[in-house]
Curated annotation (Swiss-Prot):
Protein's recorded name: FtsZ-localized protein C
Compartments, as annotated in UniProt: Cytoplasm; Cell inner membrane
Pfam families: Hepar_II_III_C
Superkingdom, natural source: Bacteria
Gene deletion effect: Deletion mutant grows with normal rates, morphology and Z-ring organization. In cells lacking other non-essential division genes implicated in cell wall hydrolysis, such as dipM, ftsE or amiC, deletion of fzlC causes synthetic cytokinesis defects.
Gene: fzlC
Keyword match Lipid metabolism: no
Entry keyword annotation includes Repressor: no
A single GO cellular-component term on record: cytoplasm
Swiss-Prot/TrEMBL keywords: Cell cycle, Cell division, Cell inner membrane, Cell membrane, Cytoplasm, Membrane
Functional summary from the UniProt entry: Membrane anchor for FtsZ. Binds and recruits FtsZ polymers to membranes early in the cell cycle. May also improve the efficiency of cytokinesis through the regulation of cell wall hydrolysis.
Subunit structure: Interacts with FtsZ filaments.
One GO BP: cell division
A GO molecular-function annotation: lyase activity
């Protein structure tokens, strides 16, 4: 993107997506060579030296912990990512079949470790036994357990818990623990797959270096910071948004950077200026993405984050709320007026490795009315049990045409080699905004439906005086041809979808068109429209990776691609 876009208008140029097959072939070949090297004796020797001497820093991860969950693990019930194992007090989960792949990933990430050590000395002793169980089976390189999907978070958790564990460990157990941390931290910096997580791997390696006492920790810190600094400017945009365009990814990165900043301070190392700058920017963006119900907006593979977790991420920041109405680099606009708040996606999806969790949902929005989140998306995330179909256009509150989507994730060999990149998405998205005392206008236009010869324009007006939101969704032909309307008539069904939050309910009025929506506060809102047909259909909403039943309002019509069509609608408070 050339230059800094103005706050009142966002323009993202098209970017090419060619050569995906060749990229996949090269990535698969490189991955094979990498796996052979990682499993070799010379590599094992390389990451084993120099031998660590002990422990130094005790990094503090600001993420909230759940001692009650740790107590359940202590009693023999291991519950992770929607799966559960009954282990008994001394069972070994690493020698037992996991109930799902998601469970196995969380298990090997040591996602259970923070909650378990939060219980106290008994939890730390149980954690040491579990780590010993893991080491016995997976202590040497393994493509799954030592892969980027598991290793990064495991090193992070081990680094933060190491000194707490050491307090309950024998000398031999401490020696094993620091050796594990040194080998895995060094290995992190050699991984080239999953390049979208390079920054997070550098942070975890830096934490490991800070925790390792004496000279063995210093080279790891130096190497991690060398990898970290250029990645910070690439992954943290000028407005604080994450380069993946996921608000939740920004919050999780903020947690990681705060943890590293704390560890560097304990080690007596100054934090790089880029690290401090990234923390400030991420904090500002986090505040921008908080909606009126206190939760984070959910876009591009990020789930809704609750108030307690947000408060923990911002506890360091005493600057207070920023009055921002747009995130121009990230591609989002926020509209606030009366009791209605809207946040809209005004940018194209990320491309390449950054798009592995992106969604083909241009111009999607979320709407909060009187602090009730009424309109949202399915909230798919990589932790979700749902299929990648939830990344398509009809899984968000935007327009969908026929059975198509404004982009699609890779599948098959390409996805295996590269990851489930999003391809064929909107390449050009423009947004224009105008604010005055009467309200806010926002126009969004994108070419995500160019394969059907159409552009989608979403025009929104938030009337602060009438306390209502008016919208118009129109589909227009890409190339205007006066003679096209005289040709054969071809119609495509299209719909404007309003996905309801699971706590919201809707009913169609007697006129068959108007829809009454109520949230937890029981305040009613009318959605009036000029669609040909209106339906309330089933939907789903993901919360912590688990699907909850929800509904969606579907405004239906038809469009001739040579002519275009539109649906107008209005959201206004019900009387009484």
């Amino acid at each position: 993107m050339a230059g800094k876009p103005p706050v009142l208008g966002l323009a993202f140029p098209a970017r090419l997506r060619g050569g995906v097959l060749w990229k996949a072939i090269r990535a698969e070949a490189a991955g094979h060579v990498e796996r052979e090297w990682f499993g070799s004796g010379p590599h094992r020797l390389k990451i084993a030296l120099p031998r660590p001497e002990g422990l130094s820093a005790r990094p503090h991860d600001p993420r909230p912990v759940d001692p009650a969950h740790g107590q359940k693990i202590l009693s023999g019930a291991l519950t992770l990512d929607g799966g559960a194992l009954r282990l008994g007090v001394d069972g070994d989960p690493f020698d037992t079949a996991s109930p799902s792949r998601r469970f196995a990933v969380s298990l090997h990430r040591f996602d259970w470790l923070p909650d378990l050590v939060a219980v106290g000395p008994d939890g730390a002793r149980r954690a040491l036994r579990l780590i010993d169980d893991w080491r016995r089976v997976f202590g040497k390189w393994n493509a799954f357990s030592w892969g980027p999907e598991c290793l990064e978070r495991r090193v992070h958790h081990l680094a933060c818990a190491a000194k707490t564990l050491a307090a309950e460990a024998s000398d031999a157990e401490v020696a094993d623990l620091v050796f594990d941390l040194a080998r895995q931290g060094r290995h992190l910096l050699e991984i080239t797959r999953a390049p979208e997580r390079t920054l997070e791997r550098a942070v975890a390696a830096g934490l490991a270096g800070c925790v390792l006492a004496g000279k063995p920790g210093e080279p790891l810190i130096d190497a991690a910071l060398k990898a970290l600094v250029p990645q910070l400017d690439a992954m943290v945009l000028g407005d604080g948004g994450h380069a993946t365009r996921s608000p939740e990814a920004g919050v999780e990165l903020l947690f990681d950077l705060l943890t590293l900043d704390d560890a560097l301070g304990q080690r007596g190392r100054p934090s790089p200026e880029a690290l401090s700058r990234a923390i400030d920017r991420l904090s500002s963006a986090t505040r921008f993405f908080i909606l009126g119900d206190g939760h984070l907006a959910a876009f591009h593979g990020g789930e809704t984050v609750g108030p307690a977790r947000i408060a923990a991420a911002l506890a360091h920041d005493d600057a207070g709320p920023r009055s921002l109405n747009a995130a121009p680099h990230s591609g989002y606009h926020k509209m606030i007026g009366g009791s209605i708040e809207v946040i809209a996606d005004c940018g194209p999806p990320p491309v390449g490795p950054l798009s592995v969790n992106a969604c083909a949902q241009p111009a999607a929005f979320e709407i909060v009315c009187a602090k009730d989140r009424l309109i949202t998306s399915c909230g798919w995330s990589p932790e979700a049990a749902g299929a990648h179909a939830f990344r398509l256009s009809d899984a968000a509150s935007t327009v969908s045409v026929a059975d198509g989507s404004a982009g699609r994730p890779l599948s098959g060999f390409r996805a295996k080699a590269l990851g489930p990149w999003l391809v064929d998405g909107a390449a050009k998205v423009e947004a224009k905004r105008h604010d005055d005392v009467g309200g806010v206008w926002l126009d969004i236009v994108h070419d995500g439906w160019r394969h059907l010869g159409l552009t989608h324009a979403r025009r929104l007006f938030l009337d602060a005086v009438q306390d209502e939101l008016r919208g118009e969704d129109s589909l227009s032909p890409l190339a205007l041809d006066p003679k096209a309307a005289e040709g054969p008539r071809r119609y495509l069904p299209f719909a404007v979808r309003f996905h309801l939050h699971p706590d919201a309910r809707a009913s169609i009025a007697r006129d068959g068109k108007s829809v009454l929506i109520r949230g937890p506060s029981n305040i009613g809102w009318w959605l009036r429209n000029d669609a040909v047909d209106v339906e309330i259909a089933p939907s789903a909403h993901f919360d912590h990776g688990l699907a909850r039943k929800a509904g969606q309002i579907v405004l239906k019509s038809q469009v001739r691609p040579e002519v275009g069509a539109k649906i107008r609608w209005k959201l206004t408070k019900a009387e009484g």
